[in-house]
Each structure stands twice: as C-alpha cells, then as structure tokens.
C-alpha cells in the first residue's frame, strides 16, 4: 500500500513539473506579454534571481516563470 502511494506521489509530481514541449511555454509566455502590454508586443525573459526556468504542466497548459519586459 505504501509503495502505491509513493508511486502516485512521484507520478503526479512529474505531471506537474514536466512540460510537453518548449513551444507551449513560448506561446503561453507570448500571450502573457500581449495581455500586459497595450501594443501586444513583448519579450519574455527569465525573472531575476531565478536560477532555473521552471516549467509546470497544469490543466494541459504549460506555464513558465517569466516576466514581460
């Protein structure tokens, strides 16, 4: 029983932190920039003090820890 629980925790953790492809991250990031900037043009760069870009798969969308600048 414990083994099953551990397996499920590992499985769901991987689902949350794995991104299907970098393309969906770029697309999501571009959408965020368009929402934040009136002209719809923006470049996405990693946030400062973010050692590594974090990808999360949530509700079939990929999100990234990025800011628009």
Curated annotation (Swiss-Prot):
One of its GO terms (cellular component) is extracellular region. It is found in: Secreted. This is Defensin-like protein 166. The keyword Signal applies. Residues 1-15 form the signal peptide. Disulfide bonds join 19-68, 24-44, 29-62, 33-64. Belongs to the DEFL family. Coiled coil: none annotated. It comes from Arabidopsis thaliana. GO terms for biological process: defense response to fungus; killing of cells of another organism. Keywords: Antimicrobial, Disulfide bond, Fungicide, Plant defense, Secreted, Signal. The lineage of its organism: Eukaryota, Viridiplantae, Streptophyta, Embryophyta, Tracheophyta. The keyword Signal applies.
